[in-house]
């Protein structure tokens, strides 16, 4: 897929994981 999407995913996924696990 597009490198831009990969970049966005790299920023979004950690945030979602942080919020989901309450380990910010």
UniProtKB/Swiss-Prot annotation:
It holds the Pfam family Antimicrobial_1. Expressed by the skin glands. InterPro entries: Antimicrobial_frog_1. Keywords: Amphibian defense peptide, Antibiotic, Antimicrobial, Disulfide bond, Immunity, Innate immunity, Membrane, Secreted, Target cell membrane, Target membrane. GO terms for cellular component: extracellular region; membrane; other organism cell membrane. One of its GO terms (biological process) is defense response to bacterium. It is found in: Secreted; Target cell membrane. Disulfide bonds join 18-24. The keyword Disulfide bond applies. Antibacterial peptide. Has activity against the Gram-positive bacterium S.aureus (MIC=2 uM) and the Gram-negative bacterium E.coli (MIC=32 uM). Has a strong hemolytic activity (LC(50)=5 uM). Belongs to the frog skin active peptide (FSAP) family. Brevinin subfamily. This is Brevinin-1CSa.
């Amino acid at each position: 897929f597009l490198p831009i999407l990969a970049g966005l995913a790299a920023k979004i996924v950690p945030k979602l994981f942080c919020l989901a696990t309450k380990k910010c």
